[in-house]
């Protein structure tokens, strides 16, 4: 018998969900190894997840983190390769707490709108959203390009970073 108020959480890395590339090139780029997108969570996909009895989806790795992918064309600072874990980076090496991982968007400038759309689709499918981060676990080159003007934020610097520049 199913309990009335039991939470069932479905944890997922959006970068893996919907990624149809079966290759696994060591230190490969997102072109070589693929990457899932927010848009892969279609209403049909979300309804299938809901059918599992899911009440909440825990989207892991959605906050912008350090990566070796070059997004300077979108005014996103480049990370030094020596301080990035692999090419994709660790989703817990937060680069900007106020922004979304550009890898997960179909259109990088619209990444926040795409994430908001994902949240809306999830709610429309009858589930709640969880995202996570580790406080103070930041990338060596933390810099917010998306924070509100009134938010004071110091760039994260370290002795290692000064040697890399």
Model-predicted segments: where are they?
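Single conserved hydrophobic/aromatic residue that forms the stacking wall/gate
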Residues: 155-165
